[in-house]
Amino acid sequence: MRQKTLDVLEFEKIKSLVANETISDLGLEKVNQMMPATNFETVVFQMEETDEIAQIYNKHRLPSLSGLSKVSAFIHRADIGGVLNVSELNLIKRLIQVQNQFKTFYNQLVEEDEGVKYPILDDKMNQLPVLTDLFHQINETCDTYDLYDNASYELQGIRSKISSTNQRIRQNLDRIVKSQANQKKLSDAIVTVRNERNVIPVKAEYRQDFNGIVHDQSASGQTLYIEPSSVVEMNNQISRLRHDEAIEKERVLTQLTGYVAADKDALLVAEQVMGQLDFLIAKARYSRSIKGTKPIFKEERTVYLPKAYHPLLNRETVVANTIEFMEDIETVIITGPNTGGKTVTLKTLGLIIVMAQSGLLIPTLDGSQLSVFKNVYCDIGDEQSIEQSLSTFSSHMTNIVEILKHADKHSLVLFDELGAGTDPSEGAALAMSILDHVRKIGSLVMATTHYPELKAYSYNREGVMNASVEFDVDTLSPTYKLLMGVPGRSNAFDISKKLGLSLNIINKAKTMIGTDEKEINEMIESLERNYKRVETQRLELDRLVKEAEQVHDDLSKQYQQFQNYEKSLIEEAKEKANQKIKAATKEADDIIKDLRQLREQKGADVKEHELIDKKKRLDDHYEAKSIKQNVQKQKYDKIVAGDEVKVLSYGQKGEVLEIVNDEEAIVQMGIIKMKLPIEDLEKKQKEKVKPTKMVTRQNRQTIKTELDLRGYRYEDALIELDQYLDQAVLSNYEQVYIIHGKGTGALQKGVQQHLKKHKSVSDFRGGMPSEGGFGVTVATLK
């Protein structure tokens, strides 16, 4: 279809509303590509797709598509030998996770809605590949940010060495900073980090007392950050280990990327299917917002839109109208007052057809019928071009000439105020001639006009119908109701009377018009009354038929469910009975066998108590079943994070780290962390651990997230600020508040200049009114 038509009908606004309902860039891309189809089979299939998903969306809670993203670029990069990072691998993992959740949802849906078929969704679910191995390979190797320590044996060893070396460095430096002899020589008794090296803050005047490397100094120059020589080699060792760690991480990521490349075709299919589902769900969401319904498409030319309304207008205030081209009608001419809704009716018809052929449910009552148009042509509104210096009439006529060149029997043509902008008699003649030409071409036409000559046009030609927009004489305003089959009538006398014009003048005016025109107006008035009555009856009949069909469908469904339930009960009862008979027969055979053995061993001397013992074995059999059921119950006890559990499928103990959802949990078994079904876990009582004496060393005091420098001299304030920032970094604070007061602003300026240069500060800002305003600076730490 022509882009100009889509622009006039504001289809881009509809696309924008659908786009707002998408979750991923995959769905958004498909919305941006959405265009009306013109092939009958394609149009029908697109509508079936949307309607099926809309039915499911309206009845069920769909799985979340959050986190779904386009990953084809990563897949192609993996295929040509690139190495994916952890973030990219996680997006691929999320794609697999989303598709698996949708598969699970669909399987449950099929079980719950027994007898209901979803052929389109079923086909999409069958297209989804099995990517379980790749999911586990990524999931068990990395989290959201980094590789797990146990991603490889080598990586675990390297990180273990880094940890132990760091611990030895800390112990060494702790001895230095806790030494009584060094207390006065240190700016603070802490260990900090500069240039990725562990250092201690030494007062500048005691530099010669510490053998080591100076890595940094405070802004005031009074504190030097020294790496003691006793830890230099250990820090060097950590640097080497970090290098080894990077190499091993690259190796593991290369291996994972290879797995992705091996599954590239399957991943691209998964991306395409999930993107299409996001697109269809967005259509379903938008359709529900406009209470959209599914039209029936027919090969023969048909337009029937019961109670249609323009989807971009306010649903609460817009007047819905039935728009219909009755059998053998090819042209509809709408007359009525200006601003009465004629143009909106044209746009409603055009936009609904464009929406329907794009696979969107349409804003009408159930039962709408449409044919598929190859093109929709519009001449709507004043498109006068100032640059071309065209008049309103010339502008419209230029557009009409272009339409007449391309319109055919597969087209819908919409003319707004046909023939307007020139002499009324010439304009009316042109309008009738243009309509004759379009009818000869075979296009379906709806036109609006205010020329009275066109009212009689339909009575002289076959296939032409009049319509009008209603005017309320009592309120002197249009009602925006469309009356199909009823031409517009003049309301001049009624309006004049309502406004207070003398009856003598009105009566004299009536004598000046012909008898025929009087009779025509009276006939039109009678037609209006009859149309309203028939339309009300037809809507009521449609409602009753729809109600009856729904009741029939519900009863059929319930009857089918009852038959299925009855069948399943009978099968279940037979199975239970067969199991009991089988068990009893086996037990009886065992008892007889044992009795025979006893008789052979003891002759006929079989005691009563021995028979009782054998009989008791049947009772024992049922008790064993009871015990088994108790164990089964125990397995389903509520499990929470921190619980000790037995993993039944592995026979191993583990600890629950996190409850993912109602069905899955993350469990640590030794050095292995796995996501497992909760039904596979059996809760265990934690063993009571004997209390052990703990020796705690406090390396630093707990600090607040704010530092109050009010009352400090400038130099002292900066020294205090330096020490505070070091402690805040070691406490892993992300944000701290420096209170300097307002005063002259000198301290505030000094603090902010100091923060600007400080290596531990990534950013800072003035405080919000709720935080202290200009008297506070908020610093964000690296």
Curated annotation (Swiss-Prot):
Q: Which residues form the signal peptide?
A: none
Q: Which PROSITE patterns match?
A: DNA_MISMATCH_REPAIR_2 (PS00486), SMR (PS50828)
* Keyword line: ATP-binding, DNA-binding, Endonuclease, Hydrolase, Nuclease, Nucleotide-binding, RNA-binding, rRNA-binding
- EC number(s) for this protein? 3.1.-.-, 3.6.4.-
InterPro entries (UniProt xref): DNA_mismatch_repair_MutS_C, DNA_mismatch_repair_MutS_core, DNA_mismatch_repair_MutS_sf, MSSS, MutS, MutS2, P-loop_NTPase, Smr_dom
Q: Does the keyword Hydrolase apply?
A: yes
Residues binding ATP, per UniProt: G336, P337, N338, T339, G340, G341, K342, T343
- Keyword check for RNA-binding: yes
TM stretches of this protein: none
Q: Which GO terms describe its molecular function?
A: ATP binding; ATP hydrolysis activity; ATP-dependent DNA damage sensor activity; endonuclease activity; mismatched DNA binding; ribosomal large subunit binding; rRNA binding
Query: Boundaries of each Smr domain copy?
Result: 707-782
Question: Please, one GO biological process term?
Answer: mismatch repair
The similarity comment for this entry is: Belongs to the DNA mismatch repair MutS family. MutS2 subfamily.
> Quaternary form?
Homodimer. Binds to stalled ribosomes, contacting rRNA.
Described function: Endonuclease that is involved in the suppression of homologous recombination and thus may have a key role in the control of bacterial genetic diversity. Acts as a ribosome collision sensor, splitting the ribosome into its 2 subunits. Detects stalled/collided 70S ribosomes which it binds and splits by an ATP-hydrolysis driven conformational change. Acts upstream of the ribosome quality control system (RQC), a ribosome-associated complex that mediates the extraction of incompletely synthesized nascent chains from stalled ribosomes and their subsequent degradation. Probably generates substrates for RQC.
Descriptive protein name: Endonuclease MutS2
Q: Which organism is it from?
A: Staphylococcus aureus (strain Mu3 / ATCC 700698)
